[in-house]
Regions:
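Polar/acidic, low-complexity leader/linker segments enriched in S/T/G and N/D
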Residues: 129-158
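Acidic, glycine-rich low-complexity segments with interspersed aromatic residues
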Residues: 149-249
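Compact beta-sheet-dominated globular domain cores
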Residues: 252-253
């Protein structure tokens, strides 16, 4: 997918909400800077719970919410389905609300203020231009020599994540892979119901619960991990399988 396709599809997600569509498209068109990445209708988790923000700029940790005078952004989606989507931890992020109950001129004034704010943030930060080709490329992180959760690292395939850690796979589909440190496992879980497994992540994203719904198999699984620590690694680097904003599969660090 190139930038043109990405941008058109992102803007197309707002078409069923007239005020959101107006504000979001006006911001993007007036900003006119495609070194800046944006995501529409981004699921986020905050200390007070999960929500849906209308426009997200990941390079700045900035969220724009279109306020129509009602709390329409709360997440109204089945819990199991929500567990599949790519959710951004917005703790510490900045949120700007656009009040569309005001006059047309006042709405446009708010948008202009947002444009100025983004341009200033770009000048005041160690800004890295959005490169749609390199952001999912393992070579990007191999050259850096590290990955950091603050960089929102994700890969399109399991093999790409594995290749960041010394592998040279052309394809790989298993949920676990070796790491140069023999005490560490690369793990690619689905954090939603998947066959007999129902893995979950806590609301604060601090703990992953690995659970088999078959009680006998669950007991064997737990006992094996406790008794054979040479075979079963207790330290894991996790890339969870999620659905990206455009429905694509990603493995998010």
């Amino acid at each position: 997918m190139d930038k043109k396709e990405y941008i058109i599809r992102q803007l197309g997600r707002t078409k069923n909400k007239k005020y959101e569509a107006y504000v979001v498209t006006r911001i993007i068109h007036l900003l006119n800077d495609f070194t800046i990445k944006f995501v529409t209708q981004q699921y986020v988790t905050r200390p007070e719970g999960r929500a849906l923000t209308d426009l997200y700029f990941p390079q700045f940790g900035l969220h724009i919410e279109v306020d129509e005078g009602q709390h329409f952004n709360s997440v109204n989606i089945e819990a199991d389905k929500l567990r599949e989507v790519d959710i951004v931890n917005a703790t510490g992020h900045k949120i700007i609300r656009v009040d569309v109950t005001k006059t047309f001129e006042e709405i446009n004034f708010q948008v202009n203020e947002i444009i100025e704010k983004i341009q200033q943030m770009k000048l005041n930060s160690s800004f890295v231009s959005w490169d749609i080709d390199s952001e999912f490329d393992p070579q990007t992180y191999i050259k850096k020599g590290y990955i950091d959760i603050a960089d929102s690292v994700a890969f399109k395939t399991i093999k790409d994540a594995c290749n960041c850690f010394g592998h040279n796979y052309n394809g790989y589909q298993r949920a676990g892979a070796s790491h140069p440190d023999p005490d560490i496992l690369l793990w690619f879980p689905k954090l939603y119901p998947n066959g007999e497994w129902d893995n979950q992540i806590s609301s604060d994203e601090a703990v992953i619960i690995e659970r088999n719904e078959d009680k006998d198999k669950a007991k064997i699984h737990i006992t094996s991990h406790l008794e054979d620590k040479e075979k079963y690694k207790h330290k894991r680097i996790v890339f969870a399988r999620v659905k990206g904003s455009l429905g694509d599969v990603l493995y998010r660090f």
